Amino acid sequence: MPRRREVAKRVILPDPKFNDRVVAKLVSVIMLDGKKSTAERALYGALDIVSQKAGEEPVKVLKKCLDNIKPMLGVKSRRVGGSTYQVPVEVRADRRVSLAMRWLVRYANERSEKTITDKLAGEILDAYNNRGAAVKKREDTHRMAEANRAFAHYRW
């Protein structure tokens, strides 16, 4: 947290194939060891599979899938006296998107399909249909926030 001035947000350039910033950001989340072309190949392959199976525009399906994963509420630890409370807080808009992308990639990697392309396509389609591990993670996060609603007055 800088003391002097607000740090400017970096502008992410849209990806070359779909000309979309969300796809470009997801490529960055998928990327390991700076291998961007490998990450692009995996995501573009997954989006091709998604467009075949869903019969819709792949970017539209991806955005709907991310909307289904985005958490509205979360919990933050807050120490009061000698005990730590899980205080429910609303998640900021930019954090919602980044959490959704991280969860999508994380739970896609845990799937049993053989290639990362198939794993990503499967998780995207599951999230699009409100199923899958990433959507379950969002539901668990919301349930945790709801369970700790009694501590909402500790919000800061």
Curated annotation (Swiss-Prot):
Entries under SUPFAM superfamilies matching the protein: Ribosomal protein S7
Q: Does the keyword Ribonucleoprotein apply?
A: yes
User: Which InterPro entries does this UniProt record tie to the protein?
Assistant: Ribosomal_uS7, Ribosomal_uS7_bac/org-type, Ribosomal_uS7_dom, Ribosomal_uS7_dom_sf
Cite the Gene3D superfamilies for this sequence.
Ribosomal protein S7 domain (1.10.455.10)
Cellular component, GO annotation: cytosolic small ribosomal subunit; ribosome
Q: Does the keyword Ribosomal protein apply?
A: yes
Q: Per its UniProt entry, which superkingdom is the organism in?
A: Bacteria
What Pfam families does the database record attribute to this sequence? Ribosomal_S7
Keyword entries, A-Z? Ribonucleoprotein, Ribosomal protein, RNA-binding, rRNA-binding, tRNA-binding
What are the BP-aspect GO terms?
ribosomal small subunit assembly; translation
Q: Name one GO molecular function term.
A: rRNA binding
Q: How does it assemble?
A: Part of the 30S ribosomal subunit. Contacts proteins S9 and S11.
Q: Explain the purpose of this protein.
A: One of the primary rRNA binding proteins, it binds directly to 16S rRNA where it nucleates assembly of the head domain of the 30S subunit. Is located at the subunit interface close to the decoding center, probably blocks exit of the E-site tRNA.
Task: Tell me the protein family, please.
Answer: Belongs to the universal ribosomal protein uS7 family.
- The name on file for this protein is Small ribosomal subunit protein uS7
Organism field? Geobacter sulfurreducens (strain ATCC 51573 / DSM 12127 / PCA)
